Amino acid sequence: MATYAAFKHVELYNVGKAKKRVLRAPGGVSSDIFGADMPQTPRNVKNLMASNIFSAEKDVAQKNNVRQGAHRFYFMGDVPRRGQKPVDSYSRLFGEPTRPFTPGKNHMKSNILNVGQNSNTAQLISNSKGNYNGKSGSVSSASSSVSSSTENLKINGGIRSEGNPVTGEGYKPGATDYIQPANNGSSQVINKNRVPPGGYSSGLW
């Protein structure tokens, strides 16, 4: 085992003589953080939390548009950069395409028809043939029979008149799916003796 005298020179002679030199500290000129003078010009630190929405821009070169995904957001007072040269090859080869002027849509305007204000809408609503609710004189026979049969159903007080409202044909005399009027004034009874599309269940499963 080595004696104490062999390693005495390592620590005893260097106490209080440690190296304290740092050439240039990262934050300033001096490495002595307690006794050094403050620098004359403070560092220009950008305050990211400060709002400049209602104030004039301090730095013209500083752009405050934020790029997120495919959208670009602009703050008040900032203009979109339309003067930039296009980057795509089509615009470089053929030039900028001419875009027609399209006025902005007024989203606050009502789209409900005002008959008194517009003569065209008044003419569309009341045509000369006396038709109403979008029905015109040039409809197919199938659709006209459907509309006439449903109107007959409304006129007759809910009692179905003879005829199929879909095809316009009359009912067969042996059909069992029909409405029987109630004798005592209660609700009508609908007889439905139909076979389901897959047939009746056998009850085995």
From Swiss-Prot:
For this chain, the family text in UniProt reads: Belongs to the MAP Jupiter family.
Q: Which GO terms describe its molecular function?
A: microtubule binding; structural constituent of cytoskeleton
- The portions of this protein that span the membrane are none
- Can you cite an annotated GO cellular component? spindle
Question: Sites of the modification Phosphothreonine?
Answer: T41, T98, T102
Keywords per UniProt: Cytoplasm, Cytoskeleton, Microtubule, Nucleus, Phosphoprotein
| Annotated Low complexity bias | 136-149
Please indicate if the UniProt record lists Phosphoprotein as a keyword. Answer: yes
Question: Which residues, renumbered to this chain, carry the PTM Phosphoserine?
Answer: S30, S138, S149
Q: Where in the cell is it found?
A: Nucleus; Cytoplasm; Cytoplasm, Cytoskeleton; Cytoplasm, Cytoskeleton, Spindle
Q: What does this protein do?
A: Binds to all microtubule populations.
Give the chief site where it resides: nucleus
Q: Where is the composition biased (Polar residues)?
A: 124-135, 181-191
Give the protein's recorded name. Microtubule-associated protein Jupiter
Q: Name one GO biological process term.
A: positive regulation of microtubule polymerization
Give positions of region: Disordered: 124-205
Protein's organism: Drosophila virilis
